[in-house]
Amino acid sequence: GIMDSFFPEASFFTEFERFDRYLDMIKRNGQQIDYVCVCSPNYLHDAHIRFGLKLGCDVICEKPIVLNPWNINSLIQVEKESSNKVHAILQLRLHPSIISLKDRIIKSSSDKIFNIDLKYITSRGKWYHHSWKGDYDKSGGILSNIGIHFFDMLIWIFGDVIDLKKEFEDKSTAKGVIVLEKAKVNWFLSVDYENIP
């Protein structure tokens, strides 16, 4: 993939302790590390971001930055103390069709409220519920694994949240309504094969 095509000589680690040791060695040899990119399971993001900041690096992290909202304030404090920055990646904002949609919405009538039905249904194998992704405490559930991409995109396009109601959530499915400045969205997310039409 990308690693092989562009970074065939990149160091690669599957154990955090070896990565930590390697970075310490680089730093002691006078080399500067500018960025740490966090692409680990959701429940490790907070700790890995803190690690990068304490190392003196800016940190690029996939979603979500933290699983629990009450953890964000202490992470912001660590960021301020480090004088480095944390950058979140939500890639749908960069998709050409999403950018085009946002441009069309901006050019639409300022008082128009859009009605949207968002249904995202994809099946996942048995592995899903046996991995960290199927463990609510480690993943944040379907809303953090899948929903966050859509909610970020919708907020980016249609404005701030006015009201949010989750009607149902279990380990495979979630349903609710989100009211934004320029849209009312009925949403349904599922990784359950039984929900595929």
Regions found by a protein language model. Name each.
Residues 42-43, 92, 193:
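Short glycine-rich anion-binding loops that position phosphate/pyrophosphate groups of nucleotides
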Residues 10, 55-57, 82-85, 182:
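A short helix->loop->beta-strand "cap" motif at the edges of active sites that frequently abuts
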Residues 72-92, 110-116:
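Rossmann-fold dehydrogenase core element
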Residues 1-9:
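Glycine-rich phosphate-binding loop and adjoining beta1-alpha1-beta2 segment
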Residues 11-76:
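Beta-loop-alpha module in the N-terminal Rossmann-like domain of NAD(P)-dependent dehydrogenases
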